[in-house]
Every structure is written in C-alpha cells, then in structure tokens.
C-alpha cells in the first residue's frame, strides 16, 4: 500500500473488480469528460488477467473507504497515468494527493524519464490536479477519440524526472532511486 496524508493507494485485487465495474457503469462516476460504455465483469477480469506492466490502485480515504481508482501503464518509453474519483469526493484534495503519490512511486521505482496524462481540454479540475503535481501542459491532441457521438480533443500533460527532483509525499527511503538513462 502507498500511504499518503489524506489517502492511500491500494493495489486492486480481483475481488475488487465488482466495485470497478459498478463505477465504470455509472455515468455520474464517469462524468461528462470521459467515454462511457457499459462494462461486463467478465471483460474487466480479462483485462485484469492480461494487465502486464499495468497496475490498478484503489484510492482510499484513511478510514479504508474506496473513493476512486487510478492506474499506470507503459506508453512507449514512459509511463502514463489515469484516475477517477466518485463525484462527492472530488474537490477535497484527494485526487491531487493520489496523483502526487503515484508520481513519487513511479519515479522512485521505475527506470523512466517521463510520466504523462491526458485529460479533456475543458476538465479544469483534472488540469489543476496535474499542475499541482508538477505536470506541464504540452498541447492539444485534436480529435483523438470518439465519444458520445463526436470526436473529442485531448490535452496532454507530462512531468520529467529532472523536473520532479524528489518525492513530495512518499519518503525518500521508500525505495532506492534508479538513475534515468
């Protein structure tokens, strides 16, 4: 478990998949900025079994209540992250801390020089989360995906290892820092 001040990140176990399915099938949880389609538990189980380097985490309040999820996956020679929280828990700093924990974790444990994240250009809350964690906006990827009847743009954000410098939440002793290539 990755421990923060407000939230912890717990590895998703197969027994957690029904919760992810329920969230993924809830249009209010997915929100207005993400693609929405119904997900079957059997499909989630197949993704879970074939995840490879991808890791999924539950975002949990300190009392153990799961309030969202996030994950990381390899994208070319870097890591990409994604995250979602239940609506009533947004705007309380939980997402910001979860992203910062993930950034610390990835730079402490993975031999990478870059972490990236995509968000909708109108999703100002998600952009603030990324900027608080040290990400910089790189630009807009025009018409990058089809969702809800239209092609949508994506805002690309990234943080480089030399911009990160040191962990903000996880302790330095959490892991030996690997040198980037």
What are these regions (language model features)?
Residues 47-58, 68:
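A short helix-loop-beta-strand connector motif used in the catalytic cores of GNAT acetyltransferases and
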């Amino acid at each position: 478990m990755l421990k923060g001040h407000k939230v912890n990140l717990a590895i998703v176990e197969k027994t957690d998949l029904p919760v992810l399915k329920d969230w993924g099938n809830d249009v209010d949880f997915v929100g207005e900025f993400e693609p929405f389609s119904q997900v079957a538990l059997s499909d989630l189980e197949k993704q879970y079994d074939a995840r490879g380097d991808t890791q999924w985490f539950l975002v949990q309040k300190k009392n153990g209540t799961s309030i969202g999820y996030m994950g990381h996956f390899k994208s070319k020679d870097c890591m990409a992250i994604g995250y979602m929280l239940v609506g009533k828990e947004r705007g309380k700093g939980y997402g910001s801390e979860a992203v910062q924990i993930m950034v610390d974790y990835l730079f402490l444990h993975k031999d990478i020089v870059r972490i990236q994240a995509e968000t909708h250009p109108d999703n100002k809350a998600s952009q603030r989360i990324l900027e608080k964690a040290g990400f910089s906006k790189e630009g807009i990827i025009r018409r990058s995906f089809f969702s809800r009847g239209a092609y949508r743009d994506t805002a690309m954000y990234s943080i480089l290892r030399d911009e990160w410098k040191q962990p903000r939440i996880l302790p330095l002793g959490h892991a030996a820092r690997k040198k980037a290539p």
